[in-house]
Amino acid sequence: MDIETFLAGERAAGGYRCGFVAIVGRPNVGKSTLMNHLIGQKISITSKKAQTTRNRVTGIYTDDTAQFVFVDTPGFQTDHRNALNDRLNQNVTEALGGVDVVVFVVEAMRFTDADRVVLKQLPKHTPVILVVNKIDKDKAKDRYALEAFVAQVRAEFEFAAAEAVSAKHGLRIANLLELLKPYLPESVPMYPEDMVTDKSARFLAMEIVREKLFRYLGEELPYAMNVEVEQFEEEDGLNRIYIAVLVDKESQKAILIGKGGERLKKISTEARLDMEKLFDTKVFLKVWVKVKSGWADDIRFLRELGL
């Protein structure tokens, strides 16, 4: 579709809907996995570790009747206070401004004080849909127990509606889309129908490397790291990408590189393969490690990183 046709609104509003949907919840309830399934493509990083999403990621799903613009947010942080986590929480609050509907994600059979903290941040005049995720878990397979859990959570807040899903297995994702659709305003689409994210290739490359860091490092180390794309060159049939991983200490650098450079090599290789699949082209990827002490508490530096 050329830009003139798109801007002219080739598809008249006439019943068509388009709007913004914020996906929020405490860390590690499956928000990023949910968004990836909602749009039908992986653009937001996932990990079993909490707080893998640091930047708001916009995913777009378009069908014949509606266009959904999803905003995936960092999990709201209640522990480990520092400038970085304060900024992540501010990102959550900012993401809620101007959306048409909010999806509040909780883990099936597990509602905690951290969930309640997030609930208190939700807007009072925007519809909020409760989404109970991970219904594939053994404890959630008891229908009556699951219904009782949903009723328990609904008693905590005035939700507009509720749905139970398994983001991991793609269960009831279509039901959730249909549930959300009436909350979007009538409008022509904001983005071309073949567009799945408004994020740049540089940003997506950075996110892929961050995902591999979370996958192959210990529980704490990835949280002390940041990823920067220092150079991104698109040539005919080849993307050349140069990425620096920022750590706080020399000891962290040694752990990341691994014995004989094996760990960094594994991270780089898997990231390159994912990039080639996403960008549909060959990728030359160079990843190295830099040490900057105290970066996570340096507010000016965090702003430079766009956090």
UniProtKB/Swiss-Prot annotation:
Xref: PROSITE patterns: G_ERA, KH_TYPE_2
Domain KH type-2: 217-293
Region (G4): 133-136
Gene Ontology annotations of biological process type: ribosomal small subunit assembly
Entry binding sites for GTP: 25-32, 72-76, 133-136
Keyword entries, A-Z: Cell inner membrane, Cell membrane, Cytoplasm, GTP-binding, Membrane, Nucleotide-binding, Ribosome biogenesis, RNA-binding, rRNA-binding
Domain Era-type G: 17-186
Gene Ontology cellular component list: cytosol; plasma membrane
An example molecular function term from Gene Ontology annotations: ribosomal small subunit binding
Protein function: An essential GTPase that binds both GDP and GTP, with rapid nucleotide exchange. Plays a role in 16S rRNA processing and 30S ribosomal subunit biogenesis and possibly also in cell cycle regulation and energy metabolism.
Subunit structure and binding partners: Monomer.
Name this polypeptide is given: GTPase Era
Gene: era
